[in-house]
Amino acid sequence: MQTQRLRIAIQKKGRLSKESQALLKKCGVKFNVMGERLVVHSENMPIDLLLVRDDDIPGLIMDGVVDLGFIGENELEEVRLDRKALGEPYEFVQLRRLDFGGCRLSIAIDKDEEYNGPQDLAGKRIATTYPQLLKAYMDEVGVPFSTCMLTGSVEVAPRAGLADAIADLVSTGATLEANGLKEAEIIFKSKATLIQRTGEFDADKVALIEKLLTRMQGVQQAKESKYIMLHAPAEKLDQIKALLPGAEDPTVLPLSADKQKVAVHLVSTENLFWETMEQLKELGASSILVLPIEKMME
């Protein structure tokens, strides 16, 4: 059933929940998540947030129950492959890959085990909560194996005698190390993504989605950019600009107290490292300020 309000599914709890909510708030969507409520209404836009389990989000999109969803690509692809195998709807539109929620699905083995490549996994029993992604990879490399399906605590499976290896999400590798495991193969790299259901939308929803996407782009650009202010010798301006790749043409203003220097203001999309600041100083720049940017719109 379609409504006039834009319905967005986000993870109720977990690694993507806070960052998805924070992104929406930075885009100007006002809402207040309280208690165990499953539906939260925006205070200033015709938007409803559905707080659900992450593995339910792809299905809600593919069945057309909600309009948009924030989801990890690993969960999205696992559900897509599963629904495709079952003959269920599995189509969606990927609107934007986001800059958070990065992880990888990896096969891990005993830390003392020698490993020379995927062929060493032949005949092994591999524990995972992502059987479809694991099967897709093992089929691609042509290695036979068996699956031990678990819903949690996958990393303990080898020590418990349930499996020879595991396929699980890895961020830093600390959990693997704590359980005597090492990463052998990366089989899927993932980030958070914003997806949309297929089908028609009315004009108001199309306009609202476009507004959100534009604002998300602005938030992401701002996160990747810095506002730089400095004083510089006028004759060194070209050399200073060359040290700041990714910068637009700067705003250059005369200094009232020193006619030989100018004030330079610019936005740079590159990280400004200490070495660069030291090089700027060597060229005669002073009062160098590097500031974060909250929002941008081109």
UniProtKB/Swiss-Prot annotation:
Disulphide bridges, residue numbers: none
Reactions this protein catalyses: 1-(5-phospho-beta-D-ribosyl)-ATP + diphosphate = 5-phospho-alpha-D-ribose 1-diphosphate + ATP
Record-linked HAMAP family: HisG_Long (MF_00079)
Keyword presence, Metal-binding: yes
Top enzyme class: transferase
Keywords: Amino-acid biosynthesis, ATP-binding, Cytoplasm, Glycosyltransferase, Histidine biosynthesis, Magnesium, Metal-binding, Nucleotide-binding, Transferase
Enzyme Commission number(s) from the entry: 2.4.2.17
Gene Ontology process terms (BP): L-histidine biosynthetic process
GO CC list: cytoplasm
Protein name, UniProt field: ATP phosphoribosyltransferase
A molecular-function term among this protein's GO annotations: magnesium ion binding
Cofactor(s) the protein requires to work: Mg(2+)
Compartment(s): Cytoplasm
Function: Catalyzes the condensation of ATP and 5-phosphoribose 1-diphosphate to form N'-(5'-phosphoribosyl)-ATP (PR-ATP). Has a crucial role in the pathway because the rate of histidine biosynthesis seems to be controlled primarily by regulation of HisG enzymatic activity.
Pathway where this protein functions: Amino-acid biosynthesis; L-histidine biosynthesis; L-histidine from 5-phospho-alpha-D-ribose 1-diphosphate: step 1/9
